[in-house]
A protein has these predicted regions:
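Active-site acidic catalytic loop and adjacent metal/ATP-binding pocket
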Residues: 186, 331-381, 476
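Short, solvent-exposed loop/turn and secondary-structure capping segments
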Residues: 60, 69-70, 98-100, 127-130, ...
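Short, well-structured beta-strand/strand-turn elements
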Residues: 55, 238-252
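Zn2+-dependent metallopeptidase catalytic core
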Residues: 150-158, 227-241
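ATP-dependent phospho-/nucleotidyl transfer catalytic cores
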Residues: 199-210, 215-220, 224-225, 256, ...
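Short, compositionally stereotyped local motifs that mark structural "simplifiers"
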Residues: 1-168, 367, 485, 495-514
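C-terminal catalytic region of ATP-dependent kinase domains
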Residues: 362-489
Length: 515
């Protein structure tokens, strides 16, 4: 500074495309310390804040970032209700400090972990710039992928704060964008201090670092069970299919209760790399992730689909009973993941093909994984079986059925597919052993959270929720036997063949899947 000069200074506000402002600072103030521990208190608390001598503290209680015009700290702040306090230090010759933030929950206990997120109203509810509102433009604000800064704190179920850092957020998902309670993606960014969230958020994952997280409002399940996607993911445990781990939590937005969410892993190159054990940064950056059939440019979520398109064209035009053709496919495709994916989704009755997903790291095979499976356990409909088991020349219904059809033309793979169906039912769908305990875990937790959640977001009653969950459990109980019948018919199995494949499985179902 001045513009074109050789003196480097900090500016209070960026001026992209314009001349720099006149006022710059050679250094910035030191972030103040909120001396009183964030967390849960039975009654009102006095919150003390300190900063180096000569620096003035300004603070807010509405979630916004303090400015030089914010309320000046003159002594401990009396907090009598759940409140977010954000503080910055200022001095005449220094740029304002980074922002300290702490949430104080007053007579507001929780049985589950709590995430407190806060940011300026301009990023949330402003009609021009806020992502939580429709706005005045032709495209709703919440449909835009605007990414804004946000401060987050994570408190474990015992009330201890385990994480506090600046990050960014975006509105995510599809069906929930227009809801009052939206799903939010959280992203750790180096520009805000760290490119990871360093905590073990999920009991069934060994990971302690995440590049992003998902606050999932349960999307299309928000007025039904509020757990289907999470429950069904856990039921798939042991099949080798990646699914997004889940933890029911409560969220506070700018200090206000904002309902039950399921904290989730965010399915992206980083979480898939953790799952697959890939650690090379270059390989992670080169990950290919596709959706639906994977054959259209619009199906590419990350990387490229060139290799996948070549593979699909190959299976459409080659007989896999030729060993060399079969080898070409099995060298490029993780067949176990395909079979496990299809069988699992047929059993749960997942008809939502918009969420078909597959990935590949350099030098690896194309691998299917589970993503947004909350459409499962909603009916006794046979249509999901039809979606997956179409003839090789049939029109796709959102799933790349060509490769499955080609493999099932090979007798040993048809045999393996049927045997694998029996194995998956026995390992994952014996109701009282493997399904009911997972449902009950979520029922016990979410059932306690619902009364307050419903007050905040009406539209679901406890009575209806109970009925919806019971119905989902009944579909999970009864569909395995029905799938056996459908497959037996579609593959033209004789009575002897059905017994050979499924007699033991049916015997177990008669023991564990009865009301």
């Amino acid at each position: 500074m001045p513009a074109g000069g050789d003196t480097w200074l900090y500016l209070e506000a960026a001026t992209p495309g314009k001349a720099n402002g006149k006022n710059g600072y050679a250094a910035r103030a030191q972030e103040p310390v909120i001396e009183t521990a964030a967390g849960f208190y039975e009654k009102a608390v006095q919150v003390a804040i300190s900063a180096p001598a000569g620096q003035e503290i300004r603070y807010t209680t509405d979630g916004s970032e303090p400015t030089r015009a914010s309320k000046r700290y003159t002594g401990p702040i009396a907090v009598s209700k759940t409140t977010v306090i954000r503080a910055r230090a200022f001095a005449d010759d220094l740029l304002g400090s980074t922002t300290a933030g702490s949430t104080f929950f007053i007579n507001d206990p929780s049985i589950v972990p709590v995430m407190s997120v806060y940011t300026g109203d301009a990023y949330l509810y402003n009609q021009k710039t806020g992502v939580m509102v429709k706005g005045s433009g032709n495209i709703p604000n919440y449909e835009k992928d605007w990414e804004y800064p946000i401060q987050i704190e994570y408190f474990d179920a015992s009330g201890q704060r385990q994480l506090s850092q600046m990050a960014t957020f975006r509105v995510t998902s599809h069906s929930s964008r227009s809801l009052r309670q939206k799903s939010l993606g959280l992203f750790a960014r180096k520009a805000f201090g760290s490119n990871t969230f360093d905590y073990a958020f999920f009991d069934n994952r060994p990971y302690t670092q995440y590049s992003s997280l998902l606050l999932r409002s349960t999307n299309s399940d928000h007025r039904s069970c509020r757990m289907r996607d999470a429950v069904l993911g856990e039921i798939s445990e042991g099949l080798g299919l990646y699914y997004q781990a889940a933890q029911p939590i409560v969220v506070y937005l700018n200090g206000e209760y904002f309902g039950h969410y399921n904290l989730r892993e965010k399915a992206n190159k980083d979480s898939l790399a953790q799952w697959a054990g890939v650690t090379d940064p270059a390989a992670i950056r080169a990950c290919d992730i596709l959706e639906r059939t994977g054959t259209l440019d619009s199906n590419v979520l990350h990387g490229s689909n060139q290799d996948w398109v070549e593979l699909m064209n190959f299976v459409k035009s080659h007989d896999l009973n030729d060993p060399s053709n079969l080898q070409y496919v099995t060298d490029r495709l993780d067949v176990d993941s395909l079979f496990n994916y299809v069988i699992f989704n047929m059993i749960i009755g997942n008809y939502d093909v918009t969420n078909v997903r597959m990935y590949r790291f350099p030098g690896g095979k194309w691998t299917f994984f589970l993503h947004d499976i909350e459409a499962g356990c909603m009916s006794f409909d046979e249509s999901p079986v039809d979606i997956f088991l179409r003839g090789k020349n049939a029109k796709a219904a959102g799933f790349p059925h060509w490769v499955l059809a080609a493999l099932l033309e090979v007798p040993e793979y048809k045999d393996y597919f049927l045997r694998r169906t029996a194995e998956i039912i026995e390992s994952n769908f014996l109701f009282s052993l493997q399904v009911e305990p997972v449902f009950n875990k979520y029922i016990d937790t979410i059932g306690q959270l619902l009364p307050r959640h419903i007050k905040k977001f009406p539209g679901l009653t406890i009575k209806d929720w109970t009925a919806n969950v019971n119905a989902a459990m009944n579909y999970a109980r009864m569909r395995p036997k029905r799938v056996i019948g459908w497959l037996s018919k579609r593959f033209g199995l004789s009575a002897a063949q059905q017994d050979a494949y499924f007699a033991h499985t049916l015997e177990l179902l008669s023991q564990y899947n009865v009301k």
